[in-house]
């Protein structure tokens, strides 16, 4: 299978249909990381679409094409944090009207195993800096170097934050299957790919 760099070079030469390969490769990673920040599956999917469109429009300026996955993850995190800030501002404007359904995302309603729900709740309750490092390193299996680059942290900070996240989650995570957390289903993958491919 061709590398990201080879695919990007062909896309830049006009083979736009190859962008679908990159999206399908990174969809699950982006969804999990987006969910760890925004905790709303519809909004996470919308952020993914925005991320893919922005990345496509800037492909020609990407110098390190072999680092596409890391670059894409940075775009997603920035967009997710921006949306999260907007949500906080909206909540402050509607002070006094507590959003009791905040944790009732469509994704959580669909999950039928108590273990998955327990894991998602535990991960979502982590402080943001620990949650991001945990999702990237343990669920997405991103390297320490990639995590350092995306989050602009030193190697020791990545390791310390991961260790603290594990300590906080130890009881809930013992013997679980992390890949089942924030599961990204095939129909959602197809929806995002089709949306972006129709826009480019």
Placement of each model-derived feature along the sequence:
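DNA-recognition helix of helix-turn-helix
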Residues: 77, 81, 151-175
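Structural recognition of an alpha-helix C-terminal capping motif at a helix-to-coil junction
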Residues: 32, 46-53, 66-78
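C-terminal edge and immediately downstream basic/flexible tail or linker adjoining helix-turn-helix-like DNA-binding
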Residues: 167-200
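Arg/Lys-rich amphipathic alpha helix in sigma70-family domain 2
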Residues: 60-63, 74-94, 112
């Amino acid at each position: 299978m061709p590398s990201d760099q080879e695919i990007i070079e062909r896309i830049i030469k006009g083979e736009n249909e190859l962008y679908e390969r990159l999206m399908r490769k990174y969809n699950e990673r982006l969804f999990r990381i987006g969910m760890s920040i925004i905790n709303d599956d519809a909004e996470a999917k919308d952020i993914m679409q925005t991320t893919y469109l922005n990345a496509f429009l800037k492909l020609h300026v990407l110098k390190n094409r072999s680092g596409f996955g890391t670059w894409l993850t940075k775009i997603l995190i920035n967009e997710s944090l921006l949306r999260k800030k907007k949500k906080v501002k909206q909540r402050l404007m509607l002070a006094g009207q507590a959003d009791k359904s905040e944790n009732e995302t469509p994704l959580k309603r669909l999950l039928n195993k108590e273990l998955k729900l327990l894991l998602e709740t535990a991960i979502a309750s982590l402080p943001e800096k620990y949650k991001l490092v945990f999702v990237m390193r343990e669920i997405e299996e991103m390297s320490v170097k990639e995590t350092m680059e995306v989050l602009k942290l030193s190697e020791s900070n990545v390791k310390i934050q991961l260790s603290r996240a594990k300590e906080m989650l130890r009881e809930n995570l013992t013997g679980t299957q992390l890949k089942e957390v924030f599961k990204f289903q095939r129909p959602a993958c197809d929806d995002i790919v089709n949306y972006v491919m129709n826009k480019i």
